[in-house]
């Protein structure tokens, strides 16, 4: 069988859905230990299920849901999101500003690919959700982690953020504000 080598883009990507932490968890599970799998973002095994009214709506709409919707997401859902955020004081948002995806992974990846050019630096909090670092790296960015200290209720260390900003860190328009 022919073997395919992995892309060099993966050299600096560590995302523990399939990495060493996952392998260790599988080993411990095989040994009889109960493992809480919090690495995949799947809330259903922990009792977080869709409310009945949403399930009823899904079932009712199945006959007309066989195909793609607008690439930004369902108009009615985007409109509801705009309304919600307008009640929270975000007045300038419109339906055209809202994108809905198939979960946070798709949207994080899409955002990083849209915003980063090869060699751009991006500030990401540490500790972080590994997908941010992986998506930024695969999009050609260089991740610069800033500290969030547990002893300070996980608030970001502003001095550390400022120390990490370089000419490659922020787009020119954003850099003017720092």
Residue ranges and their predicted role:
Residues 2-4, 11-103, 110:
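N-terminal small-domain helix-loop-helix segment of the aminotransferase-like
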Residues 65-178:
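Conserved core of the PLP fold type I
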Residues 6-8, 176-177:
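Short glycine/proline- and acidic residue-enriched helix-loop micro-motifs
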């Amino acid at each position: 069988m022919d073997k395919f080598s992995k892309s060099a883009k993966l050299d600096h990507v560590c995302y523990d859905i399939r990495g060493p932490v996952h392998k260790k968890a599988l080993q411990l599970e095989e040994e009889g230990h109960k493992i809480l799998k919090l690495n995949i973002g799947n809330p259903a095994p922990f009792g977080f299920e869709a409310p009945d009214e949403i399930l009823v709506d899904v079932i009712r709409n199945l006959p007309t849901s066989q195909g793609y919707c607008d690439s930004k997401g369902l108009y009615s859902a985007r409109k509801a999101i705009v309304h919600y955020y307008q009640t929270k004081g975000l007045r300038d948002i419109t339906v055209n500003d809202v994108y809905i995806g198939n979960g946070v992974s798709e949207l994080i990846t899409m955002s990083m690919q849209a915003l980063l050019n090869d060699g751009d630096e991006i500030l990401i909090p540490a500790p972080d959700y590994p997908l941010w670092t992986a998506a930024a790296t695969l999009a050609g960015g260089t991740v610069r982690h800033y500290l969030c200290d547990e002893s300070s209720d996980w608030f970001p260390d502003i001095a550390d953020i400022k120390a990490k900003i370089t000419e490659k860190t922020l787009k020119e328009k954003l850099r003017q504000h720092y």
